[in-house]
Curated annotation (Swiss-Prot):
It comes from the Bacteria. This is UPF0416 protein RC0826. The lineage of its organism: Bacteria, Pseudomonadati, Pseudomonadota, Alphaproteobacteria, Rickettsiales. The keyword Signal applies. Residues 1-33 form the signal peptide. Belongs to the UPF0416 family. Keywords: Signal.
Amino acid sequence: MRIFVKAAISTAAWRFYAHPTVAMGICVGTALAYSPENTFELLKNTTYTGIEAAKFAYENTAGIVNGIAGLAHLVYDNLPSYSETPQVDLVGSIEIS
């Protein structure tokens, strides 16, 4: 019986640590069941973290997109137009107009 108990505890511990997401869920679920105030705190912290992450992503994405658009606009404005480029015929001589 003693070996069976040790094996059962060992198997349970291995499964607990082998699957960290399940282990985290068990720990959070136990904490929530033990103290209902934790549910409110968990929701509050999760919501705040989600809002801050969304705000950070929005601000940085807008800055990156605006920077790329500004750089593309700068390059496009400084490209020579089609009429300013020399025209090359099939023989390879440059046509001067």
